[in-house]
Amino acid sequence: MGFTGAEVLLAAAFFLVGVAKGSAMNACTILVSDNSADRTRGMNLMHSCYACGALLCPFLIAAAARVSTSLAVFLLAALGVVLWLVYWKTPMEGKVKDRKAAIDWSFLRSGRFWLLTGLLFCQNAAEQSVTGWMVTYFKGSGIIAGTLAAYTVTVMWGATLVARLLIAFVFPFKSPRKAMVVMAVTCTLFYMLLMRADSQPAAILLLFAFAFAMAGMNPTAVASAGRMTSVTSMSIMLPAASSGAILMPWVIGRVAERAGLAAGMAMNIVPCVGLIIFSVLVERLSEQEYERS
């Protein structure tokens, strides 16, 4: 892409980045789960690193693009090489080597597995809908104008990074299941208030609060899989959950075409409410069911 500028290579690059991201998240989830005494802290720390990269990389690439578009593309390629080198040097043994070679499909019979998958589906749907549509919504409604509108995603990633670091190091969850219920309720409340925001300061503040409230949901839910965390289970849970990030933005777009963007964004309350339902169901599992599933 850097040498030719061919658009077909750009499309191929997006596809390969998607494959690489999914594979990296799957592999890192297994490694962190197998090598962390506290899975919730480990997952939040891992996702903090992800948020840090998502927050800083756009500024780095934008700076390179001011020099040359090709430089920005080559820089992305260089970062990909660095990622490959990191995996090459990362010790992969740990506890994984002690596991049996036979694939264990028992997680498919676990109610907890499917409840957590549903929870992650709603989390991905709600988060990516805001990430994908909020700039357009703010500009279209006139709430946030100019260059500030382009930095709404930066606000979200900043809030996400702060929240995950606080969970990992300052305020660790004593009861992750109850914490997920609190996060689900608060992020739903903040989203409803965000939809009613009519000024720039209120919109930015509520967007920060929404992202902050939701930040710990994904890593905490994945960590709650406990003993079910394996290459096979994550290969089903994470892609199934990620489909929410594809489906919900499409639903919002279809509704927006017919009833306006405000109505489309209001549809995002559905996965937010889904977060509450699934988190409550996970929390209501008895300790015996939770350990057995």
Can you say where each PLM-predicted feature lies in the sequence?
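C-terminal ends and interior cores of transmembrane alpha-helices
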Residues: 1-5, 186-198
